[in-house]
Amino acid sequence: MVKLTSIAAGVAAIAATASATTTLAQSDERVNLVELGVYVSDIRAHLAQYYMFQAAHPTETYPVEVAEAVFNYGDFTTMLTGIAPDQVTRMITGVPWYSSRLKPAISSALSKDGIYTIAN
């Protein structure tokens, strides 16, 4: 006969090895911060490409917080709180390399953090 403590220990071991997941709305600020973190990293890695895009599309503006985060190489996540979800979506999806570069990187970062999104 299996002891109750053995069952409890087995359940605890399984729970400890399973990665925690959270399902959030796409507009949740935690999702936006992950997206913006990827976006800022991509801007840093491809700055010339973003400058060329901005020159070709002068009406596409960025919040000052994004510009500050790009050039501040410390912890920038607190700078990015409060940017409206629709503005985050507009910025990220508005560049031609969204599907090829940003979307896969964002999906990977969300998955790594155990975050899955649902449509609003």
UniProtKB/Swiss-Prot annotation:
GO terms for cellular component: fungal-type cell wall. Coiled coil: none annotated. Pfam families: SRP1_TIP1. The keyword Signal applies. InterPro entries: SRP1_TIP1, Yeast_SRP1/TIP1_CWP. Keywords: Signal. One of its GO terms (biological process) is ascospore formation. One of its GO terms (molecular function) is structural constituent of cell wall. Disulfide bonds: none annotated. Residues 1-20 form the signal peptide. Belongs to the SRP1/TIP1 family. Seripauperin subfamily. This is Seripauperin-8. The lineage of its organism: Eukaryota, Fungi, Dikarya, Ascomycota, Saccharomycotina.
